[in-house]
């Protein structure tokens, strides 16, 4: 099945902490610059782009000179709060080099659950996009809670990006990660693991093969990416999971090159 993205106008791009923060804990400035260039190029071609960006914790750890993520929730929220400001400041500066304006939208799950607040945030997205601004979305870590009686967390930004793609009716979700896509088995263990180029149905076998948590700076593992693809399918959308090592590969993907894994349901043909 050939990839055809000519009709794609609205794109949600999700970038994870592992793509923004080097293994040393330092910020990957080159990667952020490349990402800003690619998004600005797409905007200049008439595309509408929303960026879902992790990284608040990684930025916070770097600024506060902390080597590892705190185990205490209040400290985690404090570090993320510091990091979010630094991350947005850097995004704003770098995007400005490409004459692109950005905005910040911080979400919690209850915002998209209640109809009134969902309508408000949907209108905010539409207004920003109509003004040629790139909304940069993250979860509001400083106030999100994950308690049984009042859970407001999305879980991680993989799922958040699928939610954003749904509420903005995006044509395509591109998920950048530190892996090349979805394999038939764990490529870090099995040398003969094969990359799945196209997934039309998310089977129990695929779900079972997706195990393990994320990086030390982030939270999302392969399972959350599969769950995100399921959410995208529920909204009749499509998603590409690809390596974020070179953000310019986004342009190649949109040209139809078979990078990463394309999650796209096969439409049933009805005969009269």
Curated annotation (Swiss-Prot):
Q: In which pathway does it act?
A: Amino-acid biosynthesis; L-proline biosynthesis; L-glutamate 5-semialdehyde from L-glutamate: step 1/2
Q: Which InterPro entries match?
A: AceGlu_kinase-like_sf, Asp/Glu/Uridylate_kinase, G5K_ProB, Glu/AcGlu_kinase, Glu_5kinase, Glu_5kinase/COase_Synthase, Glutamate_5-kinase_CS
EC nos: 2.7.2.11
Where is this chain's protein located in or outside the cell?
Cytoplasm
Cellular component aspect of the GO annotation: cytosol
PROSITE patterns given in the database record: GLUTAMATE_5_KINASE
Please indicate which superkingdom the organism of origin belongs to: Bacteria
Q: Which UniProt keywords apply?
A: Amino-acid biosynthesis, ATP-binding, Cytoplasm, Kinase, Nucleotide-binding, Proline biosynthesis, Transferase
Q: Which NCBIfam families match?
A: proB
Per the entry, what this protein does is: Catalyzes the transfer of a phosphate group to glutamate to form L-glutamate 5-phosphate.
Official protein name in the record: Glutamate 5-kinase
- In which organism is this protein found? Streptococcus pyogenes serotype M28 (strain MGAS6180)
Provide the taxonomic classification. Bacteria, Bacillati, Bacillota, Bacilli, Lactobacillales
Q: Which gene encodes it?
A: proB
């Amino acid at each position: 099945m050939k990839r055809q993205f000519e009709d794609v106008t609205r794109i949600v791009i999700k970038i994870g902490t592992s793509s923004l923060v080097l293994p040393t804990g330092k910020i990957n400035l080159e990667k952020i610059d490349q990402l800003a260039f690619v998004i600005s190029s797409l905007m200049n071609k008439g595309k509408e782009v929303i960026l879902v960006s992790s990284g608040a914790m990684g930025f916070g750890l770097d600024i506060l000179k902390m080597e590892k993520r705190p185990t205490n929730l209040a400290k985690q929220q404090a570090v993320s709060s510091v990091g979010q400001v630094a991350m947005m400041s850097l995004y704003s500066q770098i995007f400005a080099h490409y004459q692109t304006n950005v905005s910040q939208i911080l979400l919690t799950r209850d915002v998209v659950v209640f109809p009134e607040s969902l309508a408000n945030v949907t209108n905010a997205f539409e207004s920003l996009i109509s003004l040629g601004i790139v909304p940069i979305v993250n979860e509001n870590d400083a106030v999100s809670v994950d308690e049984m009686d009042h859970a407001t967390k999305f879980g991680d930004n993989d799922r958040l990006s699928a939610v954003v793609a749904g509420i903005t009716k995006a044509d395509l979700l591109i998920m950048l990660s530190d892996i090349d896509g979805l394999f038939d088995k764990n490529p870090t263990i099995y040398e003969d693991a094969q990359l799945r180029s196209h997934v039309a149905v998310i089977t129990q076998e695929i779900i079972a093969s997706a195990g393990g948590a994320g990086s030390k700076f982030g939270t999302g593992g392969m399972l959350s990416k599969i769950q995100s693809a399921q959410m995208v399918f529920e909204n009749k959308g499509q998603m590409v999971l690809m390596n974020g090592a070179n953000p310019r590969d986004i342009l190649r993907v949109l040209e139809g090159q078979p990078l990463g894994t394309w999650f796209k349901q096969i439409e049933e043909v009805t005969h009269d």
